[in-house]
Every structure is written in structure tokens, then in C-alpha cells.
Amino acid sequence: MVRAWYMDDSDADQRAPHMTDPPQPVELDQLKNIGVLYWQLSGNEDDETLAGIRKDRGYSYNDLIEITPEKLPNYEQKIKTFFEEHLHLDEEIRYCVGGSGYFDVRDKGDKWIRIEMEKGDLIVLPAGIYHRFTLDEKNYIKAMRLFVGEPVWTPYNRPADDKDARKEYLKTMGLAA
């Protein structure tokens, strides 16, 4: 089951949990309130529930990515890119089939929430939400990336408030100017 919490302000290793003291857990309904969707699945690539979700949501393309120094070309550069705060014009859909890592997302007050991803976790980040990704201290994740149609993974680093996806996200969240 996914765990999420508000992050501390430490500049220590990005792969550390970064929990506040005392911890401030974030519940699934709080994630849903900022547009983040979550499912707990088996962790198998051929999960039947995943097949149903893919059909219902139109996820017609998928691939697998292994993020580890031994398997990912240009590892150091990729890790820096993933951890740069950004948004996408489409949903970001990830299903963890091995290992673990963290997605950090901004809440409505612009505070960081850290979402721990482990085997079996399926997460959907809405288009226009500022976020970033990092491995945890185990330095390994294997994830299925899902897309509607042809894969597009174009990050727009913050600030990207001029993008229509960001404006629509803010409007949906009741935060439009």
C-alpha cells in the first residue's frame, strides 16, 4: 500500500525519505484532491486489473524502464533530469513492477508531498501538476510506463505556468487566477 507524507526542507541526499519530525502522513483522499490517482496491484506485468484500467483509461502503449546505474544509459544525467521540478502536458502513468522510488508532487499550497512507490503501486499524475522523481536509497526501480497513444515524455521545467495543461490543472483544482 502506498505511503505518502509531507517532506522536510533538508538539502540532504534526495534519495532519503525526508519525513518531517514529527511525520505528517498524507492519505489517499488527499492525493486524490490534487488529482493524483492510485491503485494497488500485484506487481506483475500481466496483472488483470491493470488490463482493465488500461482499457478504461485508453492506455494503449507501454514499455518498461529499469533505473539503476548498471542498466540506464547516461544514468547520472537522467537522474538529474527526473529530479528537476517539471510538468507534462499529458498524464504521467507509472506502474512499479520491481524496486522502489519516490514521486514528489506539489500540494495546493505549493508544499512537497513525497509518494513512496513500491512493487504493485500504480500511480497517475495529472497533466499540469509540478512533480519530480528520484530513486530511494536502494538505487533501483523497474517501472512500466503507460501512455495514451504514442509515447510522449516531454518535461517542462518550472516555471511552466504558461502551458495550457498547467492552466487547466489550476482551474480544476480551484486555483486559477
Swiss-Prot record:
Places the protein is found: Cytoplasm; Nucleus
Superkingdom in the source lineage: Eukaryota
Pathway annotation from the record: Amino-acid biosynthesis; L-methionine biosynthesis via salvage pathway; L-methionine from S-methyl-5-thio-alpha-D-ribose 1-phosphate: step 5/6
One Pfam match: ARD
Cofactor note text: Binds either 1 Fe or Ni cation per monomer. Iron-binding promotes an acireductone dioxygenase reaction producing 2-keto-4-methylthiobutyrate, while nickel-binding promotes an acireductone dioxygenase reaction producing 3-(methylsulfanyl)propanoate.
Entry EC no(s): 1.13.11.54, 1.13.11.53
Record's catalysed reaction(s): 1,2-dihydroxy-5-(methylsulfanyl)pent-1-en-3-one + O2 = 4-methylsulfanyl-2-oxobutanoate + formate + 2 H(+); 1,2-dihydroxy-5-(methylsulfanyl)pent-1-en-3-one + O2 = 3-(methylsulfanyl)propanoate + CO + formate + 2 H(+)
One GO term (biological process): methionine metabolic process
Positions that bind Fe(2+): H86, H88, E92, H131
GO CC annotation, single: cytoplasm
HAMAP family the UniProt entry points to: Salvage_MtnD_euk (MF_03154)
Protein function: Catalyzes 2 different reactions between oxygen and the acireductone 1,2-dihydroxy-3-keto-5-methylthiopentene (DHK-MTPene) depending upon the metal bound in the active site. Fe-containing acireductone dioxygenase (Fe-ARD) produces formate and 2-keto-4-methylthiobutyrate (KMTB), the alpha-ketoacid precursor of methionine in the methionine recycle pathway. Ni-containing acireductone dioxygenase (Ni-ARD) produces methylthiopropionate, carbon monoxide and formate, and does not lie on the methionine recycle pathway.
Protein name per UniProt: Acireductone dioxygenase
